[in-house]
Amino acid sequence: IRDVAVTGVQTCALPISDRGALARGIDDFRPRQSQTDMARAVADAIARRATLLAEAGTGTGKTFAYLVPALLWGGKVIVSTGTKNLQDQLFLRDIPVVRKALNVPVTIALLKGRANYLCHFHLDRTQQNGRLTAREDVGYLREIARFAKTTSTGDKSELSRVPESALIWNLVTSTRDNCLGAECAHYQDCFVMRARKEAQQADVVVVNHQIGRAHV
């Protein structure tokens, strides 16, 4: 918490109380003692720069319990999840809801592996090759080309009309081995580089465990 001597661990319990910020700002929010206890434990660990291993059962409200002290803290926060679906849920729903309820001006970034981001270079090359024979792949490529002109993130999860498991994505995303880096003509517009830059600048970064292990 920004100044432990002033705010103390108790500060983190206040937003979760029955008259706190979360109750006022989130519909159907109901405080739970186990949730308050966990929030205090997380806040205490942050204040002491200690390691905390917390296990809580279903219905505890674990997400809000760690997000409240994390967002009230003034330092960099990395939230790591087990799946990309949970990443998206945190980034798109849970964190914005808690941030609004707490009225804290923290910035948020979402960072996934490079295989999740459309690559302009490989998209251009695939379009120019014209080697796709399956009608489904041709249709998917057309959808991806349209997506490339409108997306600000390049995150393939945003394009629901093309399944994330579709093989066409292998042709329009990059790997560490075939990425041209700074030599690429699209480097300034690279979605991977943009996501990494935003993650460096953000107060809260949402990653998955694979990315977390690779970069921490």
What are these regions (language model features)?
Residues R30-P31, E55-T58, G181-D189:
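Short, flexible loop segments at the rims of nucleotide/cofactor-binding pockets, characterized by
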Residues A47-Y66:
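Walker A/P-loop
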Residues P15-G25, K76-D203:
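A substrate-engagement module of RecA-like helicase motors
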Residues A202-G212:
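Conserved two-lobed SF2 helicase motor
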Residues A13-L53:
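Conserved pre-motif I regulatory segment
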Residues A43-D44, T63-K76, R93-V97:
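Walker A/P-loop NTP-binding motif
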